[in-house]
Amino acid sequence: GAVPCGKDGRQCRNHADCCNCCPIGTCAPSTNWILPGCSTGQFMTR
């Protein structure tokens, strides 16, 4: 099930302790310095 996360409340298929949504809808922890909340790996992609 998708969970709301990020300031826009976008539905993401995955959940993390620090959940944010990238423009492409990826839900990931805020570990990316350049794009906070965006994961550079595939382990958190939808």
Swiss-Prot record:
Q: What is this protein called?
A: Iota-conotoxin-like M11.1
Q: Specify whether Secreted is a keyword of the entry.
A: yes
Swiss-Prot/TrEMBL domain comment? The cysteine framework is XI (C-C-CC-CC-C-C).
Q: Name one Pfam family in it.
A: Toxin_19
Where found?
Answer: Secreted
Query: Could you give a GO molecular-function term held by this entry?
Result: sodium channel regulator activity
Q: Which domain of life is it from?
A: Eukaryota
* Residue ranges of the propeptide: 46
Gene Ontology annotations for the cellular component aspect, listed alphabetically: extracellular region
Found, by tissue, as follows: Expressed by the venom duct.
Q: Which family does it belong to?
A: Belongs to the conotoxin I1 superfamily.
Which residue positions does D-methionine occur at? Answer: 44
Instruction: Could you list this entry's UniProt keywords, alphabetically sorted.
Output: D-amino acid, Disulfide bond, Ion channel impairing toxin, Neurotoxin, Secreted, Toxin, Voltage-gated sodium channel impairing toxin
